[in-house]
Every structure is written in structure tokens, then in C-alpha cells.
Amino acid sequence: MKRAGGGVDFISSLPDEILHHILANTPTKLAIRTSVLSKRWKHVWYETPSISIVCNRVDPDSLNKTLSSYSTPKIKSFDVTISRDVTVPEIDTWINLALSRKAENVSLRFTSHYRFRDTFFINSSLKQLSLTLVYCILNPKCVVSWSSLRNLSLNRCKVSDDSIAKILTGCSLLESLTLNLCDRLNDLDLSKSLSLRRLEILGDRWTPERIVAPHIRYLRLENYQRPSTLVDVSSLTEANLGLSKHVLDYFTCEMETESLQYMVRQTVVKLQNIKKLTIGGIFLQILSLAELCGVTLPVFQNSISKL
């Protein structure tokens, strides 16, 4: 294979391992197209350790037929975005592919109604999992066993207190947890997650009312309607707090305003001894108003910065 103008095609002369690395950073749809370049490229993508699928205009049947040729025994990264209606068996096929090839990093984004099979919750290969489930309820009926999982990100998931507790019980090595716009959570108890060091909660009116997280070192907490009550964050060293400007729309009368000031004060009381605290403008505005109203605020021993 030569380039136009008679030059040598150095890329095709590279070892398979390097070509696999190149294709691993390419959407699977484009990686598959390289198979028509020459005989040298015909089977290269079959053993690429990463799959990235965006299913919006792609025909699922055609995609499944193509993926049936995928032969690598081990997947490092599996990323699927489904922004169109597909059938449950089609989703099952893609997830089973990831599970059967022992994928380590899995990212799934669904806008279809779907219920995960029990086999999804029993996996010793997963190290990083990100789920964006617009219409799905995450409610495992079996015992969860994600024994190698270290990073978990749940986005737009409907997950109850009992369900998150069951999930976390099966993640003994979990170090980082992100909850983004997840509803149905009231009490988030992370006291049994001994390895958890990082917690990020980005929410709206459905953010947890109470947070028990005695082992975390870093907390990012951005709420919409109200601050969460920090029951135990005794190991915390750094926090990032923010409130949406819309929070002021929900606290209009004098009694509600005083309640908001009290909740914000109680939050910062829990954080007065941490090494680094970053607060957003609305949060700072409420603190300043509370001080003007005679509310006693804690004295911070370390650095505070504003977003």
C-alpha cells in the first residue's frame, strides 16, 4: 500500500499492537471502515481493545452483523450511546459482548426503557462504570458483586436508597462515586464504603436530604433546591459547594429564607476545619445575608475560595 504520489505508507507497516492502539481512540464505525483499505487492514479492527458505538442513525442489525466478526478476547473500553429506539434484545447483545470480553471501563447511555439483567450486576472485571439512564430504573434484584469496581458514575438514574445501598455493598474497592441528576435518593449512607474517597453530587430538587460519608476526602456538592444535610464527613479535607441561582425562587418568604440560611450555616459548620473549601456565588450570597441578619458563622482555619 502506497500513498498518493508514490510515497511509502508507514502506518500500515506498524505492528498490530500500535494499530490497535490507534483504532482504540477512533469511533468503532470509522475503525470498521479501515478494513477496506487493503488486505493488511482487513482484520486489524477485529482485535481493537476498545469499542465506541453511537446508535442514532446506524442500523442495529447491520451493526450487530459487523460486531459478530469482533474477535478480541479482552475489551479495555466499551462505550455505547443509544439515542434512538432499539429493542431490548439488541441492548442485551451489546452488553453481553462487553461482559463476555471482560471489559474494564464501561460507559452506557440509554434513552430507551431498559431493565438490566442480573448477570450485569455480577462482574469481576469492571473497574470503571458510567451509566446514563434517562428512562431506566436502576433496581438490582440480585446480590451485586462488582468486586474490582473503583469508579462509579450514575447520571439521570432513578435509584432508591435501598438500591444504592445494595449496589455499594457489592463494591468493596469503590474509590469514587458520582451522582448526577439522580432522583429517589433521600438518605445516602456511605458509612460502609470504607475505600470511598471521592463523592460528587450534582442535583436538582431530588438531591439526598442527608449524607453520611465518614471516609471521603473530597466532596463536590451542587444542589438546586436546597443544601443537603451533612451528617458525617469527618475525614473530609477538600470540598466544593455550589447552589443554583434558582434556589432563591423556592425560598421567598421570611420564614423560608431563614430556613435556607440555617441549612447553609449547618453545612459550613461541618466543614470549618477542612484544608480547602470552594464555594459558589449563590452560596456565598446566602452566607453573607445570614451574617447581616445576625447569624453567627463559624471561623475557618484554612483557605476558602470562590468559584
Swiss-Prot record:
Top-level taxon of origin: Eukaryota
Residue intervals of the F-box domain: 8-54
SUPFAM superfamilies: F-box domain, RNI-like
Stored InterPro entries: F-box-like_dom_sf, F-box_AtFBL13-like, F-box_dom, F-box_plant, LRR_At1g61320_AtMIF1, LRR_dom_sf
A single GO cellular-component term on record: peroxisome
Pfam families linked: F-box, LRR_At1g61320_AtMIF1
Transmembrane segments: none
Protein name (database record): F-box protein At5g03100
Organism: Arabidopsis thaliana (Mouse-ear cress)
Organismal lineage: Eukaryota, Viridiplantae, Streptophyta, Embryophyta, Tracheophyta
